[in-house]
Amino acid sequence: VSAIAALNSTLPRTQRFSSSDLVLSIDSLARSYPLLQVMNALFSNASVALNSVAGEKVDFALATMGVSPTVIIASSRTMSDYHDRIMQPHTGPISSLGRWVQSRTLEAGNMPSKNIFSQLARIGPTAELSLDKLRLICISHRIDGDASARLSSEQLTDLRVFTGARVVYALTGPGIAGAIAQTNVFDYRCLTGQSHFGSPLSSTEVTLTGMSESHVSDGIPEGQVR
């Protein structure tokens, strides 16, 4: 229960699930994060869509076919594969121009609005998708999962630009209800390398071990998550 409440409270009031949402999970409900996000949707009186195409690694276009959700719950592996196989190769000169303009808006701290540049950006990378109502993508990465599936800040920026949706990126782990940490939905920073996972959820207590006290200070918290 506390994990469901924590997932709900990490979203600002204007971005939380509501009765007007259609939530689609394309990640397996055998995993804690997608399951509790679906329960969060039900608690918020949102509609939930389920299909037979769900798992850690699925075809994003196939899994979203025939439905127009406002919220999608997916794994980092699914989104990483779709970005590398479809989005990046199909980003031509026109899409690149639209992406450049839209990414400048994100760097300024604002979510790009739907305009001519957003349409230009999506000409190639998301032409096969019908996600006009999509407003939020909830992505999770398992702490014991394949490191190659971790998303970079650049990939998260592409997902925001090409889908027109905000993105939250969560770190999950075995035995953890919901998530260990999750990014802020309004954090649009594009940093070098792999993206961070934000701050810990209110339902999680994180203990760092494996570092001697002489090497750890309040300014540099380091260690292994226990």
Region annotations inferred by a language model:
Residues 2-22, 29-105, 166:
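Conserved AMP-binding/adenylation subdomain of ANL enzymes
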Residues 18, 27, 36, 201, ...:
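Eukaryote-biased feature marking scaffold/signaling PDZ-domain proteins and nuclear chromatin regulators
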Residues 22-24, 225:
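Short, well-ordered beta-strand segments
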Residues 25-26, 140:
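Short hydrophobic segments within beta-strands
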Residues 26-29, 160-161:
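Short low-complexity stretches enriched in small and charged residues
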Residues 28-30, 147-148:
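Residues that cap or flank secondary-structure elements
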Residues 109-226:
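Conserved AMP-binding/adenylate-forming
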